[in-house]
């Protein structure tokens, strides 16, 4: 004897009564919201959450509502709105079909990052109990594809620590699709290879702040341009007249140039490919503003930054990781150090701290901060 087929019960009403019936069923808690309604000529069928008794079906029939059971394999289920639910559903379907067991036995990612159509899950994902036979399965890539789709992407990769190389290259394990990404963030288009370019989504508030500065008429030097985290906001939103972007990772240079062209600002950008200790030397006296966005410290470029400023002075945006209780002292020491570098290099500036931005927690008790330091020449050096 064959096993009974599981069914879903549908309540059928004339189409013109659909809105009223939908509201009534939903209000009574009878509407099965994980299943799509059905349409049949002049009728609409609403899925029900439970089996109705003969007497209940008879009562509904007297009101013109006819209830029929339909094989659940033929109905269409709604895609879950919550991405966590969509991910769990995709995993369960693959596990049950290919392994004959539930995905509840394994730990699934609870957070992820999306760069365009690439979904990045944290380091260590898919390594715990129950994942060995999944990774070795000849249909594993179908699971990775389903998971990427469930999270709104088309590619899936696992993050890894930043490589210990000169370029601080990202490391990731690509499970499905391509590592090349294109996306728009805060009105700026980016395109680069995420396997070769570091991207920090956590600095979004600082990128927005820098983009909100009025840079019209200014020439800016970005000492650590990367793929354009700050260069592009300064050009697109800040309206900088020109940005000199210093970067030595070839993949970042490629991504920066491509992204600048996408945003139509490549005509106001000069990319200096190479070590900024050398490239910034060629920009002496040209900048109204220098951005120093390297963590954990940008100190190695401070002297070159002071030299880049025009004789009329300007601004330095100094990034640093600092222990919370030492921030005030760090600001004072940094200003003193910048003034010392000015004197040492024959630049008659007087630096003052104008603003300190606490960007985010980098580690317990350690903050990523940005000091906005203003450089002014002494009064007797100003030409009227």
PLM-predicted stretches and their roles:
Residues 1-384:
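SAM-dependent transferase fold signal centered on methyltransferase-like domains
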């Amino acid at each position: 004897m064959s096993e009974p087929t599981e069914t879903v019960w549908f309540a059928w009403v004339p189409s013109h009564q659909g809105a009223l019936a939908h509201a009534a069923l939903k209000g009574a808690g009878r509407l099965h919201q994980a299943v799509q309604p059905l349409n049949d000529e002049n009728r609409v069928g609403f899925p029900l959450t439970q089996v109705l008794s003969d007497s209940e079906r008879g009562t509904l029939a007297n009101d013109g509502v006819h209830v029929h059971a339909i094989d659940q394999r033929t109905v269409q289920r709604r895609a879950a709105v919550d991405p966590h639910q969509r991910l769990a559903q995709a995993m369960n379907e693959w596990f049950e079909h290919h392994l004959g067991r539930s995905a509840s036995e394994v730990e699934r990612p609870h957070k992820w990052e999306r760069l365009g159509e690439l979904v990045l899950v944290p380091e260590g994902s898919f390594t715990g109990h129950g994942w060995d036979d999944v990774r070795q399965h000849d249909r594993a890539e179908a699971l990775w594809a389903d998971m990427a789709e469930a999270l709104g992407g088309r590619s899936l990769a696992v993050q890894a620590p930043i490589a210990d190389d000169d370029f601080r290259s990202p490391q990731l394990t690509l499970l499905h699709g391509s590592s090349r990404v294109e996306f728009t963030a805060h009105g700026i288009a980016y395109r680069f290879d995420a396997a070769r370019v570091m991207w920090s989504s956590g600095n979004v508030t600082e990128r927005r702040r820098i983009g909100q500065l009025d840079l019209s008429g200014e020439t800016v030097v970005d000492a650590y341009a990367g793929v354009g985290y700050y260069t592009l906001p300064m050009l697109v939103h800040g309206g900088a007249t020109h940005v000199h972007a210093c970067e030595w990772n070839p993949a970042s240079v490629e991504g920066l140039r491509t992204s600048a062209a996408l945003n139509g600002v490549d005509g106001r950008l000069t990319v200096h490919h190479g070590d900024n200790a050398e490239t910034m030397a060629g920009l002496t006296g040209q900048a109204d503003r220098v951005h120093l966005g390297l963590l954990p410290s940008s100190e190695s470029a401070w002297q070159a930054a002071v030299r880049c400023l025009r004789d009329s002075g300007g601004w330095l945006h100094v990034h640093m990781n600092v222990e919370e209780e030492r921030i005030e002292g760090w600001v004072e020491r940094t200003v003193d150090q910048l003034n010392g570098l000015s004197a040492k290099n024959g630049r008659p500036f007087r630096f003052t701290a104008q603003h300190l931005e606490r960007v985010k927690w980098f580690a317990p008790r350690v903050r990523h901060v940005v000091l906005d330091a203003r450089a002014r020449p002494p009064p007797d050096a100003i030409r009227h």
